[in-house]
Amino acid sequence: MLFRSIINIIDQRVKNITPYFTSYTLSKSALYTLTKSLSVFLAPKIRVNGISPGPTLKSKNQTQKQFDNQVQRTPLKKQVRLEEINNAIDYLIENKSVTGEVLTLDSGQSLGWANSKSKVFSTD
């Protein structure tokens, strides 16, 4: 039996909501929900999963300094490489038991740690 796979590119913003990207976040949240719904509706012949990347490429609305700052505010302090996204897509294609999952590759950006206004403890 031939199995097919759909992989949607979502965004970590569905987990890390800000008031600055309302329409974008709304559309990606809808795609997130569609991914979950279709994974049930299209099973068992078609598997549906998603990837939610974080800071990968500089936006046309960002300066390089702003993008670098965004990357430095993630817990891992690293840019998500396209190769890492490709590897995640390969994982979702190859593993026939995975459906309805959304993998977040964002260096921890969706955890919102850098956005916290309170300092809980010193790391010095």
What are these regions (language model features)?
Residues 32, 42-56, 98-105:
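Conserved Rossmann-fold SDR core element
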Residues 3-30, 35-43, 55:
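Catalytic loop of short-chain dehydrogenase/reductase
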Residues 65-84:
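Catalytic Tyr-x(3-8)-Lys segment
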Residues 1, 43, 75, 97:
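Short conserved AdoMet
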Residues 116-124:
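A short alpha/beta connector and helix-capping loop motif
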Residues 19, 27, 49, 77-78:
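Short alpha-helix in the Rossmann-fold core of NAD(P)-dependent oxidoreductases
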Residues 50-65, 114:
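Short beta-loop-alpha junction of Rossmann-like oxidoreductase domains
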Residues 78-105, 110, 116-117:
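C-terminal substrate-recognition "lid" of short-chain dehydrogenase/reductases
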